[in-house]
Amino acid sequence: MSDDLYSEEPEKTSETPLEITIEKPPVDLQEIESGISIDDSLVYLIGPIDEFTLTDIIVKCRVVINNRDSEKAKLPINLVIDSFGGCAFSALGIIDYIENLDVPVNTICRGKAMSAGALILAAGTGT
């Protein structure tokens, strides 16, 4: 071992290159259907807010909007929130989505809406 610490080569730990994979959750139609009520225009946001929650809310809102009759096309979506919060970036994504929908979104707190959940609760665009 030499006295100069900077002259030594670092040990190689692996011969394979580092791969970055983004895990994509499988789309489970039964799970999506359990989180919405098309007749009442209800979408449920229950649990922690993360990147999967963002995708989940977008899919659920699209399902509600796409399965409405033409008479109910402009009725508001009711987003029911029960969350301790979570990722602020995902919450901001949900807020951007809500603000850019063609229909109003009523936000309803059932239980708790803390942290990122409170941001989403305050962002409702309905009555």
Where are these regions (language model features)?
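Terminal-region recognition feature
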Residues: 1-127
